[in-house]
From Swiss-Prot:
Keywords: Calcium, Disulfide bond, Hemostasis impairing toxin, Hydrolase, Lipid degradation, Lipid metabolism, Metal-binding, Platelet aggregation inhibiting toxin, Secreted, Signal, Toxin. Its EC number is 3.1.1.4. Belongs to the phospholipase A2 family. Group II subfamily. D49 sub-subfamily. This is Acidic phospholipase A2 S1E6-c. It catalyses: a 1,2-diacyl-sn-glycero-3-phosphocholine + H2O = a 1-acyl-sn-glycero-3-phosphocholine + a fatty acid + H(+). It is an enzyme of class 3 (hydrolase).
Length: 139
């Protein structure tokens, strides 16, 4: 019960595109981004250091790089417009910054979908920080 309460408190603080990103991951990869990717590898979750450990972790690395290139809005809180069409996501709206955030999230969600078979939770879930000490590659 305590775990559910803590999870509820954490989710209350999440807003904007992070909730939308979770929805995209659910739509495209058919799994929860929060539960599957929040503590995976060196780049999935908050922050990111070292080298991506596998193709799934690379999805998170590329997503972090994409967010780093966003200007004129906060990518973690900006709410954007998108539609679900067939089996995909189409980003819309007139705000270039919000559209860029949407594209970052869309590409990452597709990457998770396309790399589901590389996910190795036994090896990379809650990876110790000392495993992520290499010099990072440039975005």
């Amino acid at each position: 019960m305590r775990t559910l309460w803590i999870l509820a408190v954490l989710l209350v603080g999440v807003e904007g595109s992070l909730v939308q990103f979770e929805t995209m991951i659910m739509k495209l990869a058919k799994r929860s981004g929060f539960f599957w990717y929040s503590f995976y590898g060196c780049y999935c979750g908050w922050g990111g250091h070292g080298l991506p450990q596998d193709p799934t972790d690379r999805c998170c690395f590329v997503h972090d790089c994409c967010y780093g290139k966003v200007t004129n809005c906060n990518p973690k809180t900006a709410t954007y417009s998108y539609t679900e069409e067939n089996d995909g996501i189409v980003c819309g709206g007139d705000d270039p910054c919000k559209k860029q955030v949407c594209e970052c999230d869309r590409v990452a969600a597709m990457c998770f979908r396309d790399n589901k078979d590389t996910y190795d939770g036994d090896k990379y879930w809650k990876l110790p920080p000392q495993k992520c000490q290499e010099d990072p590659e440039p975005c």
